[in-house]
């Protein structure tokens, strides 16, 4: 997830009419030394970012309601806090995947999460990390901020 989206969610979180209520986003943005005005994200864009995230949260929650023992692969997770917003039961295996430096930043900025949760530091286009993912249950792949960064060849493989 790009810094622009994170800032949009933080703006939404402090709005009196918040759509997503992503308070972890606001906390994380407050801890990052960056001039967020460079993102040029405005109120309506922040709402759009939050609405997109909320819809993906709804779909993820519906999948987990139907599959109480599922695996969620959250690809290119960035600093997204979907696992905290959804708060899945401990029967759900949740795996956040992103580049190693992004995972390190996640660990520094976001709280620890219990249950069957782990973070994998890898490019999602590398297949080696998939070898460690058990294929023993229904699996949902969530990739909100990924496809626009893939080359055509990466997207097709």
What function would you assign to each model-found segment?
Residues 1-73, 77-122, 132-136:
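Rossmann-like AdoMet
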Residues 125:
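Adenine-nucleotide cofactor-binding loop residues
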Residues 128-129:
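Short acidic active-site motifs
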Residues 141-142:
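A conserved beta-strand element that flanks and buttresses the S-adenosyl-L-methionine
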Residues 149-157:
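A short, conserved alpha-helix within the catalytic core of class I
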């Amino acid at each position: 997830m790009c810094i622009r989206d994170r800032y949009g969610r933080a703006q939404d979180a402090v709005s009196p009419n918040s759509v997503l209520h992503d308070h972890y986003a606001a906390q994380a943005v407050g801890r990052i030394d960056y001039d967020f005005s460079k993102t040029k994200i405005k109120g309506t864009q922040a709402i759009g970012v939050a609405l997109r995230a909320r819809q993906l949260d709804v779909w993820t929650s519906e999948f987990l309601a139907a599959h109480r023992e599922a695996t969620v692969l959250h690809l290119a997770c960035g600093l997204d806090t979907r696992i905290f917003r959804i708060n899945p039961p401990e029967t759900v295996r949740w795996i956040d995947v992103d580049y190693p430096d992004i995972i390190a930043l996640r660990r520094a900025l976001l709280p620890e999460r219990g249950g069957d949760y782990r973070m994998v530091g890898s490019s999602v286009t590398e297949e080696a990390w998939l070898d460690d993912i058990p294929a023993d249950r229904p699996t949902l792949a969530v990739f909100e901020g990924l496809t626009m960064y893939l080359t055509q060849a990466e997207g097709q493989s």
